[in-house]
């Protein structure tokens, strides 16, 4: 996937409020993998309140409108009064790459690429750091499998194959 030229929501990961009374039955683990995020404006990937996410091998390439953010994820937290959770997201971080020279330090330390958005009386930021990827299951509870590229491989694949039509044209 190519997420390009947005001011924000690159992606806005899984806000628990969208589930209403179905939160316990419809919310599951989310796998955000092999995306190219370009020219993000004011924010890159953010949100995730009290959810569970694999953030793997995504390529963050700043463009002319990109703010100099030194992170992959801006993690949000909800308090218990919101009735939708009371924690930052649980994250498995691996292989993400930030092409901005101002942010090269986060490529070697994925956790330094997570910004825990300050929202008052926050819980510990280390509780949600997962050391192994989350299992992703289909509706029938079978485990899903996917091809995983390196972040650089994903960047090359997206530039080579993503576009508006099957046949490459001037727009692609």
Q: What spans do the regions from the language model cover?
A:
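Extracellular low-complexity, Gly/Ser/Thr-rich intrinsically disordered linkers
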Residues: 125-172
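Glycine- and acidic/polar-rich repeat regions and solenoidal domains
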Residues: 1-145
């Amino acid at each position: 996937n190519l997420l390009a030229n947005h001011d924000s929501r690159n992606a806005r990961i899984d806000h628990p409020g969208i589930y209403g009374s179905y939160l316990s039955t419809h919310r599951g683990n989310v796998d955000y993998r092999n995306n190219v995020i370009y020219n993000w404006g004011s924010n890159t990937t953010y949100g995730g309140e009290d959810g569970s996410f694999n953030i793997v091998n995504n390529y963050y390439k700043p463009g002319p409108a990109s703010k100099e953010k030194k992170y992959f994820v801006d993690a949000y937290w909800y308090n218990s009064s919101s009735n939708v959770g009371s924690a930052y997201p649980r994250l498995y971080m691996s292989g993400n790459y930030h092409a901005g020279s101002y942010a090269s330090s986060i490529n070697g330390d994925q956790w330094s690429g997570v910004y825990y958005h300050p929202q008052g009386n926050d819980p510990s930021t280390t509780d949600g750091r997962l050391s192994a990827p989350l299992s992703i299951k289909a509706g029938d509870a079978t485990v899903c499998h996917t091809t995983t590229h390196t972040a650089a491989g994903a960047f090359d694949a997206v530039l080579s194959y993503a576009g508006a039509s099957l046949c490459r044209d001037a727009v692609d």
